[in-house]
Amino acid sequence: MSKKIERKDRKFKFETLQLHVGQESPDPVTDARAVPIYQTSSYVFRNCDHAAARFGLADAGNIYGRLTNPTEDVFEKRIAALEGGSAALAVASGAAAITYTIENLAQQGDHIVAAKNIYGGTTNLLEHTLPAYGITTTFVDVFNLEEVENAIRENTKAVYIETLGNPNSDVVDIEALAKIAHKHKIPLVVDNTFATPYLVRPIEYGADIVVHSATKFIGGHGTTIGGVIVESGKFDWEASGKFASLTEPNPSYHGVSFTKACGPAAFVTKIRAILLRDTGATISPVSSFIFLQGLETLSLRVERHVENALKVVQYLNDHPQVEKVHHPSVATEASQQELYKKYFPNGGGSIFTFEIKGDAQKAKDFIDNLELFSLLANVADVKSLVIHPATTTHSQCTEEELLDQGIKPNTIRLSIGTENIDDIIQDLDEAFKAVQ
C-alpha cells in the first residue's frame, strides 16, 4: 500500500492556495474556520525578555498594530504564495506600496528607470514628488530594450514597469527587462495590479519585487483601499553591492543587517521595521479581512472578467464608430502578439482603452450616455466601469506624456465587469446610438 502524502508535502494549485494559505487549520483559539479580525492596537509580552526579543527581531511575533496584525499576516502569507514570493507586506494603499518600495531602494542622489506607460499617479510620484527628496527618474520606452539599458546609470537602483501598461494594457517583456536589470545588479520591480497572479506571476520571469493595488482585482468589489509588496527572495542584495541600507548595520535599528537577520524576507522586513514604523501607512485588520475574502474568489472573478472583456474587445473592434481598440488580443504589432501569447495564454486585460471616432466631446458624450457602466476613478470592480483618462486619471500629465502613454482626447478607458455579457454590450450599443 502506498504511503499517504501529508498535506504539508502536497503541491496545491492556485485555486486551492487562494483559499487556504496562512490558515491551514482553524483558528487555534476559537476554532473559527474563517480568519478572525484581530481588532487590537497592541499585544501583551510574557515578560521583559520576551519583549526585548520581539523588538530585536529575534522573535518574529507581534509588537504593535502599526507594524503587524494576525489578520494581516494571513493576507500577506496568502498573496506571497499566490505570487510565488518569499514574503509580503500589506499597507494602506497601492500608492503606499509603490512609494515604500522606491524609498526602500533609493536614497538621496539615486536614480530609477521607469516605463513611460505606467499609472499616472506613479508617474507623478517619480517625476514630481520624489525629486524633492533627491531621487530622480528617467522614463523610457519599455519596448525599446536598448533605450532601457542605456538609461541605467551607476546610481540607478531599480527598473520599474507594469505587467500591463496603464491604460492601454500593452504587454511588456518581463523576462527581457529582468535580464537587463540583473546585468546591472539592480532589481526589477513590477506592478502586477492589472494582471493579477492568476494570469501571470512576474517572479517566474525574473521580477524581484511585485507590487499591487489590492483595491483592484484582489478586493474586487470596490469597497476597500489597500496595497501589497511581495519580495521574490531571489535577488542577492549583498552581491549587488548597491544596497547598504539592507546589507550593512542599520543605525536606526540597533545595528541590524536586514539581509543577515532576515534572509529572503530582508526587503519587506526593512520596510516594516523602518518605513512603516516611521511613516505609518498601515493596513487595518478589517481591510485585510476583506482582501482575504476577495482572494478566495480571485480566480473565478478574473476568468469571468477576461471572458467578458474579450467579447467586448471584439464587439468594439468591429464597430463602425470605433477608431481603434487598444488590447493585446487585437494588437496589430507582431511583437505584442508574441508577448501576449507568452505571458497571457489564458487571456488578459479586462482594463483597456479605445478611441471613438470624433473629438474629446464625442468621447465624453458617449460616456455620459452609458447607464450600466459607472463613471468613477477605479478599475477591476465586478461592476463595469468607464472613465475619460485625459481629463481625469492622467489629467496632470503634459501633452507629451499623454502621447507617450497612448492617451488621446477621444480615448475612453473601460474596465469590464462580471455582468452578463449581453447586458454589457447592449449598454455600449445604446451609448453609440445616442452619439452617432
Predicted segments, located by residue:
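Short amphipathic alpha-helical segments
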Residues: A60, S86, S287, F291, ...
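PLP-dependent enzyme catalytic core of the Aspartate aminotransferase-like
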Residues: S2-K4, S86, E127, T136, ...
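Positively charged, small/polar-rich N-terminal and surface patches that mediate targeting and assembly
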Residues: R7-V21, P70, V230, A380-D381, ...
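Short, acidic Gly/Pro/Ser/Thr-rich loop/turn segments
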Residues: P26, V44-C48, D236-W237, L298, ...
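Conserved C-terminal alpha-helix-loop-beta "cap" of PLP-dependent enzymes
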Residues: V302, L310, Q314-N317, Q321-I412, ...
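Conserved PLP-enzyme active-site core in the AAT-like
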Residues: S2-R10, G22, P26, A87-D318
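N-terminal glycine-rich, Lys/His-bearing helix-loop that initiates the first secondary-structure elements
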Residues: M1-D59
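Conserved N-terminal alpha-helix of the aminotransferase class I/II PLP-enzyme fold
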Residues: N47-A96, G121-H128
